[in-house]
Regions:
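Amphipathic alpha-helical segments used for helix-helix packing
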Residues: 117-136, 153-156, 186-187
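Secondary-structure edge/capping motif, primarily at the C-terminal ends of alpha-helices
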Residues: 93-97, 126-130, 159, 188-192
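Generic hydrophobic, amphipathic alpha-helix propensity
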Residues: 25-36, 53, 78-86
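Solvent-exposed, amphipathic alpha-helical segments
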Residues: 31, 35-43, 85, 89-93, ...
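N-terminal intrinsically disordered/low-complexity leader segments
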Residues: 1-27, 216-221
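Hydrophobic alpha-helical connector segments
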Residues: 77, 92-121, 201
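Helix-turn-helix
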Residues: 31, 39-73, 77
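Amphipathic alpha-helical packing segments from all-alpha helical-bundle domains
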Residues: 84, 88, 135-161, 171-183, ...
């Protein structure tokens, strides 16, 4: 004789320490990402094992594989976390100056170098280690680079003069400027931040000003 299961016996996972099962799972995932940012940024992706990440996060391997299929998947999540934090930081500083190109550029540059200096481990992951592990990051690296280029295009377009180039040429110019800024940050990190921030900001401001005059950006002509 078969009996029908009583629906009342099927209970959701009970809260533990005031947190639901999903909240605890999210917290474990975040702990793994934070651990990966620290270790990948300090030691490099190739030198860090899953065991090291779990030890840093104070979690077992069971919880690693609950959240990520592989070390490469965690690398992608760590890189995305840091780049998202950086973009949010520069947008906060740039947003009040969207109608004033020189102030907009200065705010963005000061926060870029400021973010790198305040967060050297995150900056190494985002600016240096990411270059070394582009193969493991897959499309993520190119996508975030393109996001940076697109941000520059979006904030510049409303300020363009009549002699603006075609969109394709404009995009090449934006990629060149972004590439120069990333390379400068990489060199700054490699020299242990030897050059003062004010000099970096002034030098890159002049670069942006030259591009701005070429484009006829209001405030530079």
């Amino acid at each position: 004789m078969t009996t029908q299961a009583d629906d009342s016996s099927i209970k959701p996972a009970r809260p533990y320490a005031g947190k639901s099962a999903q909240e605890r799972q999210n917290a474990r995932r975040l702990a793994l990402v934070d651990a990966a940012v620290r270790l990948f940024g300090e030691q490099g992706f190739s030198a860090v094992s899953i065991d090291m990440i779990c030890a840093e996060a104070a979690l077992t391997k069971r919880y690693f594989y609950e959240a990520f299929a592989s070390r490469e998947a965690l690398l992608t999540a760590a890189y995305e976390s840091v780049t998202r934090e950086y973009f949010q930081a520069i947008l906060v500083k740039m947003t009040p100056h969207m109608a004033d190109a020189p102030k907009l550029v200065r705010a963005g540059l000061k926060e870029t170098f400021g973010f790198v200096r305040r967060n050297p481990v995150k900056a190494r992951l985002m600016m240096v280690e990411a270059m070394n592990v582009r193969g493991q990051l897959g499309d993520m690296y190119g996508a975030r680079y393109d996001d940076f280029v697109e941000l520059l295009l979006q904030v510049t377009r409303p300020l363009l003069g009549r002699q603006a180039p075609s969109d394709k040429v404009f995009r090449v110019m934006a990629k060149a400027v972004v590439g120069a800024l990333i390379h400068l940050c990489q060199n700054w990190i490699a020299t242990d931040f030897a050059q003062p921030v004010d000099e970096l900001v002034e030098g890159t401001e002049r670069l942006f000003a030259g591009v701005g005059r070429e484009l006829g950006v209001r405030g530079y002509n």
